[in-house]
C-alpha cells in the first residue's frame, strides 16, 4: 500500500495532528484503543495508508510525535486518543525552544533530531511502498518552525525521492501570540521553499473568521480551529484512503498543482462548513458545494483569491456524486470567473471524486488552490520582518544560539524573490508565456 508517515512537531503541530487522527479514526471505524468497530469493508480496504496493523488486530497510527518539552506530549497521552499511538513514537526533550527558531533548528532541536530520525526510519522500514511524509507544525514558534524545518531537511536527505507535504499554520496579523513570529516564519518559509514538495497554508485569523462568520460561534477555542484544519487534512487525503472513481495521491496532486517548483504554497478550503457537534439539517447539491468552495469566506488562509489569479486548483469531492455534475460545475466556475484563472494554463482545475462521504454528511468537497494572491500572506510577514530586522530587534536571542545575521538576510531575500515570482506570473499573459518558453 502507499503509506504516508505523519509527523507532528511543537505544540500547535501536536494539537492539530491529534485532531486529524481523531477525524480519520472516526472515518475508518477505529476506536480510541485502535480496535476496528466499523461496519463497512471500504473502511479497512486501504487503512494501511495511515495505520500499521499490530499483532492483536490493533491499528496503530504511522505517526511520530515530537516536541522539545514534555507538556504537550503528556496532554496527548492523557487525551481521549492517547492510547492509540505507539509509545516509542513519542520523542521529546525537556528544555523547550522558547519560541526561538534557532533553538529548534540549531541547538536543542539538533540534539533530539537523531532519535527522531531513528523512529522515522523504523516507520519507513515497516512500510510496504512508502509514498511520503506529512508534517503538521506552526511557523511562528520555536519547535514547530525551527525543529520542524530541520526535520524536513533531514527527511529530504534520507528520502530524496519521497513526497513531503506540510500543513503549516502561518502567523496571522490579528492573532499573534509571539513578538518574534515574523523572524521565525521568514526563516521557516526560507526552508519550506527549498525542501517541501507541497505546503498547505493555514492561518488562525481565517479560521477565527470562519468560526465567527459562518459557524456563528461566540467564543471559538483552538479545539474548534483544529477541527476545521482536520476537515481539510482528511479531505486532501481521502482519495488515498478510500476507493473512488477518480483518485489522486500526493504526487498526482503535486504534478497537477505546481507549475513552477518554488510556487508550492496552497490555500485550502472545505465545504460544507459545519461546527463540531452540530447536526446537519440541509442536503447540499454539487453546485452549492462548488459555490461555497470557491467563496473566499471559506478559505482557511487569510488572503483574498479575487485579488490574484489561480495558477491551478484541485477539488476533491466526497459522496455519491455523478461525475457529469462535477465536470459541468467545474467548467462553469472556470468560464464564469475566467479572469481569476491564468489563461496560459488551459485546464487549471483537477478534480478527484471519492465515493465515501465523511461521517455524518452526504457529500463534501475540499478545495486546494495555487493562487498568486497568497503573496499577501508572505508580504505581511515580510513587512513585519523588515521593520524589526532593520533595528536588529531581538536578534541577540538568535545570534546567541550561534546564528549569523547573514542567514536572516538570505531568508529575507528568498522571501522577496518568492513575492516577485508570484507577481510575475500574476501579470503574465499568453504572449508573455511564449517568452517564458524561449528563456
UniProtKB/Swiss-Prot annotation:
- Please provide, in alphabetical order, the Gene Ontology terms of the cellular component aspect for this entry: cytoplasm; microtubule
Kindly list the residue ranges recorded as spanning the membrane.
Answer: none
Question: Binding positions for GTP?
Answer: 11, 69, 138, 142-144, 204, 226
Q: Which residues bind Mg(2+)?
A: 69
Recite the UniProt keywords alphabetically.
Cytoplasm, Cytoskeleton, GTP-binding, Magnesium, Metal-binding, Microtubule, Nucleotide-binding
> Is Nucleotide-binding there in the keyword field?
yes
Function, as annotated: Tubulin is the major constituent of microtubules, a cylinder consisting of laterally associated linear protofilaments composed of alpha- and beta-tubulin heterodimers. Microtubules grow by the addition of GTP-tubulin dimers to the microtubule end, where a stabilizing cap forms. Below the cap, tubulin dimers are in GDP-bound state, owing to GTPase activity of alpha-tubulin.
Q: How does it assemble?
A: Dimer of alpha and beta chains. A typical microtubule is a hollow water-filled tube with an outer diameter of 25 nm and an inner diameter of 15 nM. Alpha-beta heterodimers associate head-to-tail to form protofilaments running lengthwise along the microtubule wall with the beta-tubulin subunit facing the microtubule plus end conferring a structural polarity. Microtubules usually have 13 protofilaments but different protofilament numbers can be found in some organisms and specialized cells.
Protein name as it appears in the record: Tubulin beta chain
- Species whose genome carries this gene: Encephalitozoon hellem (Microsporidian parasite)
Q: What is the lineage of its organism?
A: Eukaryota, Fungi, Fungi incertae sedis, Microsporidia, Unikaryonidae
What is the name of the gene encoding this protein?
Answer: TUB2
Amino acid at each position: 500500500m502507499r503509506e504516508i508517515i505523519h509527523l507532528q512537531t511543537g505544540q500547535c503541530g501536536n494539537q492539530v495532528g491529534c485532531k486529524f487522527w481523531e477525524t480519520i479514526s472516526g472515518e475508518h471505524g477505529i476506536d480510541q484503543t485502535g480496535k476496528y468497530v466499523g461496519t463497512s469493508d471500504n473502511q479497512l480496504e486501504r487503512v494501511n495508508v495511515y495505520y500499521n496493523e499490530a499483532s492483536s488486530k490493533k491499528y496503530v497510527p504511522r505517526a511520530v510525535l515530537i516536541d522539545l518539552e514534555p507538556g504537550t506530549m503528556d496532554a496527548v497521552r492523557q487525551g481521549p486518543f492517547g492510547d492509540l499511538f505507539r509509545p516509542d513514537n513519542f520523542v521529546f526533550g525537556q528544555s523547550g525552544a522558547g519560541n526561538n527558531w534557532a533553538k529548534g533548528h540549531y541547538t536543542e532541536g539538533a540534539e533530539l533530531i537523531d532519535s527522531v530520525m531513528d523512529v522515522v526510519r523504523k516507520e519507513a522500514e515497516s512500510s510496504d511502498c512508502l509514498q511520503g511524509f506529512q508534517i503538521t507544525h506552526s511557523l511562528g514558534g520555536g519547535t514547530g518552525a525551527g525543529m520542524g524545518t530541520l526535520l524536513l531537511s533531514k527527511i529530504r536527505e534520507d528520502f530524496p525521492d519521497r513526497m513531503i507535504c506540510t500543513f503549516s499554520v502561518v502567523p496571522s496579523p490579528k492573532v499573534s501570540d509571539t513578538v518574534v513570529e515574523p523572524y521565525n516564519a521568514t526563516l521557516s518559509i526560507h526552508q519550506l521553499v527549498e525542501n517541501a514538495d507541497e505546503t498547505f497554508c493555514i492561518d488562525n485569523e481565517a479560521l477565527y473568521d470562519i468560526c465567527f462568520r459562518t459557524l456563528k460561534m461566540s467564543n471559538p477555542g483552538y479545539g474548534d480551529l483544529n477541527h476545521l484544519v482536520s476537515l481539510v487534512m482528511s479531505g486532501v487525503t481521502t482519495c488515498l484512503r478510500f476507493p473512488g472513481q477518480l483518485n489522486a495521491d500526493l504526487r498526482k496532486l503535486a504534478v497537477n498543482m505546481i507549475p513552477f517548483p518554488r510556487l508550492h504554497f496552497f490555500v485550502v478550503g472545505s465545504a460544507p462548513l459545519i461546527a463540531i457537534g452540530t447536526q446537519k439539517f440541509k442536503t447540499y447539491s454539487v453546485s452549492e458545494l462548488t459555490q461555497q468552495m470557491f467563496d473566499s469566506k471559506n478559505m482557511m488562509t487569510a488572503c483574498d483569491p479575487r485579488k490574484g489569479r489561480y495558477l491551478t486548483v484541485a477539488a476533491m469531492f466526497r459522496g455519491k456524486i455523478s461525475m457529469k455534475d462535477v465536470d459541468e460545475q467545474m467548467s462553469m466556475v472556470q468560464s464564469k470567473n475566467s479572469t481569476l484563472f491564468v489563461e496560459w494554463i488551459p485546464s487549471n482545475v483537477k478534480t478527484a471524486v471519492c465515493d465515501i462521504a465523511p461521517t455524518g454528511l452526504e457529500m463534501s468537497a475540499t478545495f486546494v488552490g495555487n493562487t498568486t494572491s497568497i503573496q499577501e500572506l508572505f508580504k505581511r510577514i515580510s513587512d513585519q520582518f523588515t521593520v524589526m530586522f532593520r533595528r536588529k530587534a531581538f536578534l541577540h536571542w538568535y545570534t546567541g544560539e550561534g546564528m549569523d545575521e547573514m542567514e536572516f538576510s538570505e531568508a529575507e531575500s528568498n522571501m522577496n524573490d518568492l513575492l516577485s515570482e508570484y507577481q510575475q506570473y500574476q501579470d503574465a499573459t499568453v504572449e508573455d508565456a511564449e517568452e517564458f518558453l524561449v528563456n
